[in-house]
Curated annotation (Swiss-Prot):
GO terms for biological process: translation. InterPro entries: Ribosomal_eS17 (IPR001210), Ribosomal_eS17_sf (IPR036401). This is Small ribosomal subunit protein eS17. GO terms for cellular component: cytoplasm; ribonucleoprotein complex; ribosome. One of its GO terms (molecular function) is structural constituent of ribosome. It is found in: Cytoplasm. The gene is RPS17. It comes from Encephalitozoon cuniculi (strain GB-M1) (Microsporidian parasite). Belongs to the eukaryotic ribosomal protein eS17 family. The lineage of its organism: Eukaryota, Fungi, Fungi incertae sedis, Microsporidia, Unikaryonidae.
Length: 120
């Protein structure tokens, strides 16, 4: 059974993950050094808890199972993928290729358009 972490640890780790995501790693020792450089925490126990939660948080973010952290580079990449415009629209095609069954349905319902049966 895992350790339940308090709000201070979670909030500090989330803030560090948002601001310094590029410096993080999937190892506890590396993240402990990042916490020591970035945060002003006097307690050794609290530093270790933040670094441990930061390590698990980093792994969850890489997997894509944790959505509560806003990382600027990830958001820019997501927007770039969403804004891709195809060179040729599917709606602007002169002739739509359909299979035999679909062509029979089109004729039965009386739809008009430029349909063509493609060969298999």
């Amino acid at each position: 059974m895992g350790c339940v972490r308090n709000k201070i640890v979670k909030r500090a780790a989330r803030t560090i993950a948002e601001k310094y995501f590029q410096r993080l790693d999937s190892t506890f020792d590396h993240n402990l050094l990042v916490v020591q450089d970035v945060a002003v925490v006097q307690s050794k126990k609290l530093k270790n808890e933040i670094a441990g939660y930061l390590t698990s948080l980093y792994k969850k973010i890489l997997k894509g199972t944790y959505n509560k952290v806003y990382i600027k580079s990830h958001e820019e990449e997501r927007e770039r993928k969403e804004n891709v415009i195809p060179k040729e629209s599917m709606l602007d095609v002169d002739c739509v290729e359909v299979d035999d069954v679909t062509m029979e349905m089109i004729k039965r319902y009386g739809y008009e358009g430029n349909f063509k049966v493609y060969g298999m």
